[in-house]
Amino acid sequence: MRKTIIAGNWKMNLSLKEAVFLAHSIREKIPSISKDKVSMVFPSTLHLENVSKILEGSSVIVGAQNCYHSGLAAFTGETSPDQLKEIGVKVVMVGHSERRQFLGESNFFCNDKIRFLLKNEFTVLYCVGETLSERESGKTLEVLSSQIREGLKGIDSVFFSNLILAYEPVWAIGTGKVATPSQAQEVHSFIRKEISGLFVGASSISESISILYGGSVKPDNIQDLLKEKDIDGGLVGGASQKISSFAELF
């Protein structure tokens, strides 16, 4: 049975004081109401250690928004998975649309990260999704297929148990727009089918992978989204950055 996951992406928001306050609030509130859902938060890199210490021993998982695909080395400005392990972080987000759009991260670059992380016993949250222009030109499925096939190329089947996917329609992020549950379900179903075609035997593996929806998820739409067969949770931006709205997602 697939896990239902509510993952909060704090992006480059919140001061240290705000992040610490939110982490304490989450520790106090979320474990008691999460029930059968898995809760995750992805603070900014500078706040990871503080938030990890606060949530240590709770059911809330702390993840990193990014890292580099290397051990300790001369890559100025980057963060190594080795450094993340030192502070107890074992989940990393890869391929978020903002990193693709503004920092030029390609499917192949994402693939380098994913393969390195999985081989080093991390769980990866891999983000895929189309822009407004790609959607309007009818290229949604083509774009997603490339992101899945190129981003997950060469990954051994044994590692797929540590893989989570998130579909984030770029046109819906931070705009207040949201795909209808049926529109989101159609794309999630396609993603699952694409995974099932990656290699022989992938069909059963694809059924076990959680696929989150990540387009302006809020308390007033999360329940309708979760009713769909292939939507297994949410990758949440703004609504995860206040304890009141984050708690309502559970």
UniProtKB/Swiss-Prot annotation:
Pathway: Carbohydrate biosynthesis; gluconeogenesis; Carbohydrate degradation; glycolysis; D-glyceraldehyde 3-phosphate from glycerone phosphate: step 1/1
Keyword Cytoplasm set for record: yes
Subcellular location: Cytoplasm
Record field: transmembrane: none
Residues reported to bind substrate: N9, W10, K11, G174, S216, G237, G238
Classification via Pfam families: TIM
Entry annotated with the keyword Calcium: no
Protein name: Triosephosphate isomerase
